[in-house]
Amino acid sequence: MSGLTSVREAEDLWQKIQLRRCKREQERLKHPDVELRDGDFRLRGLVAGERVLEWEFIENETGTCTLQLSLSHYLAKWVMDHRGRAKRNVIINIEKQGARWTGMMDHYRVIKTDAGDAYIEIVFLHDFEQTKHIRVWCNPFLRPELQFPKVWIIFGPAKWCLLVTLFVNLLRLETSLWTLPDDPTDINEWMGPSFNPANWRNIVKPFPFLADNSPVTMVFSRFGTFYDTAKKILEDHQLTLTCRRYIKDRDPHPFEDLKGLWGIDPVEDLLQKIPLRDGCVVWDIEDNSGWGTQTAFGGSWLTGFVRGMVQLAGDGQVEGVDVFTGDYTFPGEYYSPWFMGTSPIAPHVVFEEGPLTGIKSSEFSYYEATDTSFLAGGQSAPGINEGISALVNIGGDLLTSFINSQLAALGAVGGAIDLPPLGGLLDAVLQPLYSDVFGAFMEVPTLRAMGISLPISGLEDIVTGLGDFHYFENMADGAMKAFTLSAFAAIASQIHKTRARTTHTLKVSDAAPYIFAPKPYGHCWIGDRVGTSVLGYPVEHQLFVERIRKVKYRIDKDGMKPLEIEIGYREPKNPALHILEEIKRVNGALGTAGIL
């Protein structure tokens, strides 16, 4: 503040800051704007006087919204009259502090209590639910009767692969490629006019391929839902799939923030001129991982966050964290007084345990390791049954040759007898006896009973063991061939499930002191990294870095309730298990495609 030259200027600046904080607090406490719209996204009314309104944002999952209205409410009558309105779908739009929650009605219930109270309860599902109703075709450009290749496969950066997969299937749905449109009476839905994006109900936000810093992966599916196709990739790479409806005359063009990303002015100007219909769902993926850049994975109150760099392991996607010892750099937006939010490069939001902090409730759990030896199998390893069968067939055929040669020595009588090969007969008789007997099971011991280090932040150098008294054996679920990739992956998975591990979840209050809202309205939002401490943790001042998983709002007869914020600890991945699972996943895709 070297520009201040008098006490008066300092007081004016102080008053300006306090006014800005007051406006921010008023915006936080303001009642949300709630609208009900029909199936064509036409406004039918503003909701006021509701009995209960509860809605939640969940990262990469479908949130729900519950709205309770009195039966005398005009919108309650409109919702109940599903036969009387032309477009039966009901869409809710809730706006608060820049966050927009939209979704379609799943069902409604008319409830009467013992006390004679009656009301309607309407349940909505967030627009994210659409990902569970979009199928990833093997070839979105062909009819279902002719699908070649056998499976949809795309390789590249995770964000780009997922958005391309979603786009080509939305293109198929929105343009009615080689199929009858949803509404045959609407000429705009037929092939030709349907290529106009102004008629689309969904669109994918474009972005430059070279700007995608997410890890490389393979996306594949054979008529699975996009939700199932993307779920594991989103979780592994800490990506957040977002969807937000565009409302004309209220929102800037959703592609406006792409200015400067491409470096090609004509392309950027063209993107901002793409017409979008009112209510169009704009899909995008936010990368909150800080992959390939320095970020925080833990630290303490004394030393601050310890920066680390995410490194690629042998499987191309497993996280390995190296401590960053260079000069720390901070995002340029942190130096702007108008910026609100946090960056994965240098997260600044930290919640401390204590009686007067924003943490309402927390749960830190430690699970002890159990078994020390693991079994898998049920079927003989590849080649064993087949080898025994071949030996039995060869032995039977040799026996047949020997018998026939002995019979031939008997002269005219023996020459008239020629036995067929007995190998197949003997194999059929003996197969139930030798099948899955040799090499049908495998055992993998562990060293958990001896001294090992604990997988807990701050305690890695303390060597401990389970002791002489411990659990003995466990077995991988399901029957499988022993000594195969599937068997090793199953055992690795079982070892990973029964390892010593920790979990950490919290519920924190809003504005204590951080505001939960999207940029630029709040300090942190869904998917952002934040720091937390653990009550009574053996390492004093230890900090963990978690990600925000869920934000839940509730309004009832007593007004706005405190936010429920859930912050979850992401357990580290087992690199060996991840490699085996990835190889198995890729082999399955290539096998389905007929390549392997």
Curated annotation (Swiss-Prot):
This is Minor tail protein Gp28. It comes from Mycobacterium phage L5 (Mycobacteriophage L5).
